[in-house]
């Protein structure tokens, strides 16, 4: 199972390495080389719980054992969402609605950002990396709070969220500024979301900065 950079197919990583690195050195995304070849039997998933579906999908993309995948899913969602089905499908008179607001921050981003920290923690163990992971990310709203809440107090991870001081709502700003967790930080910047994003990308290609962090047993990810 190999992941390749979208900007350089010669850059190849295994799934755990791709999870930990985030972006490739030249700014590309890591994509599964055989994406589309692995088939998922959707009929077998009918009637399955969210947890069972999540585990079935993850088996196609990560190099974890079944036990590790099950643990990731359990720790990501159990007791953290207000509905036992996580994303329940609600029937209306003329259709259906998939509810994506049952997470800890009421944002749809909770679905993915509750799982990512567990994947990160497990990947660190798989590759036997002794460094802690520092997540740097920019937000214009919901992503920041969801990421902070997801990574809150997850072992061997730290997260810092940058947001435009005048570019988020009062509610979103308050959510981030009052975030709990020993490993969470937020920082407002002068500028817009693109400025925050560009600043983070510059840090990721700053070899001296990354070298200094590694001297403190910290590795960047996004």
Regions found by a protein language model. Give the residues of each.
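PLP-dependent amino-acid enzyme catalytic core
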Residues: 1-222
């Amino acid at each position: 199972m190999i992941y390749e950079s979208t900007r350089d197919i010669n850059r190849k990583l295994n799934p755990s390495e791709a999870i930990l690195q985030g972006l490739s050195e030249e700014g590309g995304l890591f994509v599964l080389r055989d994406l589309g070849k692995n088939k998922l039997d959707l009929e077998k998933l009918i009637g399955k719980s969210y947890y069972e579906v999540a585990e079935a999908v993850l088996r196609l993309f990560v190099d974890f054992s079944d036990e590790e995948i099950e643990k990731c899913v359990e720790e990501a969602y159990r007791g953290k969402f207000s509905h036992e089905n996580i994303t329940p499908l609600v029937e209306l008179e003329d259709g259906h609605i998939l509810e994506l607001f049952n997470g800890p921050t009421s944002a749809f981003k909770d679905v993915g950002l509750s799982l990512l920290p567990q994947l990160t923690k497990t990947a660190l163990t798989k590759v036997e990396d002794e460094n802690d992971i520092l997540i740097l990310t920019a937000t214009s709203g919901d992503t920041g709070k969801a990421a902070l809440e997801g990574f809150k107090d997850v072992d061997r991870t730290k997260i810092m969220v940058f947001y435009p001081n005048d570019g988020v709502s009062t509610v979103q700003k308050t959510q981030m500024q009052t975030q709990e967790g020993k490993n969470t930080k937020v920082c407002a910047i002068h500028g817009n979301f693109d400025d925050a994003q560009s600043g983070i990308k510059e840090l990721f290609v700053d070899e001296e900065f990354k070298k200094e962090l590694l001297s403190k047993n910290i590795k960047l990810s996004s």
